Amino acid sequence: MAQSDFLYPQNPRRRQEVNRLHQQLLDCLSDSFQVTNKLTGVLNTHLGCRLAFIEMKSDGTIKENCDIIIQAMTKIQKELQKIDEALKDQLEPTLYRKLQDIKERETEKIAIVQKVISVILGEATSAASAVAVKLVGSSVTTGIISKLVSVLAHIGTSLLGSIGVAVLSLGIDMIIQAILGAVERTQLQAAIKSYEKHLEEFKAASAKYHHAITEVATAVKRQLR
């Protein structure tokens, strides 16, 4: 037991809590990498994009890994915006507005996109139309992805940002040392509060993102049957 633990008997418990929260944060980060790569694969395959897959930087900091995901998502948003603009140019205004109408049936939207998708992509597939309907101008890009980008940016600039993602494998003391070194001996309570605050936001945003991209993948499978 460290000497300070005699003065602060709750410190061992706090160390364990930091360890647990750190692992949860890494799990969320890992999931975001996987889901982003799944989305990248769908866009490359069905919308003709040439987006690069991303990989978690095991020797990097939490901020560096957040930035990798943010950069990938920003590129995805730009690609979807290009397709959205192309749809707007090719479709009659009334038809384009139907794509934005949440009350409009998805099958009707796919039929609308199917009319012009070959002009935009050079080929027309129902899978491409389904992906476009699910992602272009939808709440996925305007809300869910933007929210996750915002959450990741906040995590990156927080006191957690400078902590390495690999410190977990080095033991609890290394995590604590990394935290204390990063924030000049800020108490463990502050670290725990920061983890809890950001994890609450991250888990919520990540879950919505995961669900949305799973829906896109499911829609593609339906069209390929």
UniProtKB/Swiss-Prot annotation:
The chain crosses the membrane at residues 155-175. It is a single-pass membrane protein. The keyword Membrane applies. GO terms for cellular component: membrane. Residues 69-92, 182-209 form a coiled coil. Keywords: Coiled coil, Membrane, Transmembrane, Transmembrane helix. The keyword Nuclease does not apply. It holds the Pfam family DUF4533. It is found in: Membrane. Its main location: membrane. This is Single-pass membrane and coiled-coil domain-containing protein 3. It comes from Mus musculus (Mouse).
